[in-house]
């Protein structure tokens, strides 16, 4: 049957199918995009919890940088605690290779006693123990090479440990990737690098630096 031109242009049969074909890709992109970005925010929050846990372990554990043991101790006079830190004081920056081997460098403008390291101390902060969760507990996709731990002179003191250096400890996660799942197929999104995450704490009961 041949349909006249006027009737053809007024015919709306099949319009719903056309509208669905237009709307469904947009709807699916929005819906699955919410899932992907929700998972990204979940990983972001997990990363922040990981650096908080790492900073807490670092401030109560033996330092990774062995040279910290040789640094100037907290002033014996409590009135001197909190005064300005002299130039060229210590700043140990510890990172791990892709294989997980830790090494430390001296921060720009700082003076460090030596750059010997404790692999066990780094592994404890990263992995934790049976009784204490480490960074990996909160972010299972984390790699050792993405963790940076810095011990820097602060001029602060810790009242219950007057004979040991009290560094400012900063634990960071850098270059941690996020892989899109749904949007990788829909829009070609690949892997992105998440912004750096860090947590800073003042050293407390670092037992290897404590002298009764």
Residue ranges and their predicted role:
Residues 32-35, 39-40, 55-59:
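Short amphipathic alpha-helical interface segments enriched in basic and hydrophobic/aromatic residues
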Residues 5-8, 38, 190:
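Short N-terminal micro-motifs specific to bacterial/archaeal maturation
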Residues 11, 20-23, 40:
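Membrane-interface junctions
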Residues 39-48, 61-64:
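Membrane-proximal amphipathic alpha-helices
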Residues 2-3, 52-212:
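Short, conserved structural patches
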Residues 1-13:
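N-terminal leader/signal peptides at the extreme start of proteins
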Residues 16, 21-35:
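Alpha-helical hydrophobic helix detector
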């Amino acid at each position: 049957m041949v349909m006249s031109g006027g009737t053809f242009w007024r015919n709306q049969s099949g319009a719903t199918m056309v509208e669905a074909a237009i709307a469904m890709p947009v709807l699916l992109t929005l819906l699955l995009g919410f899932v992907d970005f929700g998972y990204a925010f979940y990983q972001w929050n997990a990363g922040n919890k990981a650096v908080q846990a790492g900073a807490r372990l670092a401030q109560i554990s033996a330092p990774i940088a062995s040279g910290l043991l040789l640094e100037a101790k907290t002033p014996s006079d409590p009135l001197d605690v909190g005064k300005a830190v002299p130039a060229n004081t210590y700043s140990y920056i510890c990172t791990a290779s892709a294989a997980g081997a830790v090494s430390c460098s001296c921060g720009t403008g700082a003076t460090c006693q030596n750059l010997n390291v404790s692999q066990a101390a780094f592994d404890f902060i990263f992995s934790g123990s049976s009784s204490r969760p480490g960074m990996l507990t909160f972010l299972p996709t984390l790699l050792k090479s993405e963790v940076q731990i810095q011990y820097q002179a602060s001029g602060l003191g810790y009242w219950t440990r007057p004979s040991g250096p009290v560094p400012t400890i900063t634990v960071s996660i850098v270059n941690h990737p996020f892989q899109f799942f749904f949007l990788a197929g829909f829009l070609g999104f690949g892997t992105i690098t998440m912004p750096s995450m860090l947590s800073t704490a003042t050293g407390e009961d670092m037992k290897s630096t404590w002298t009764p």
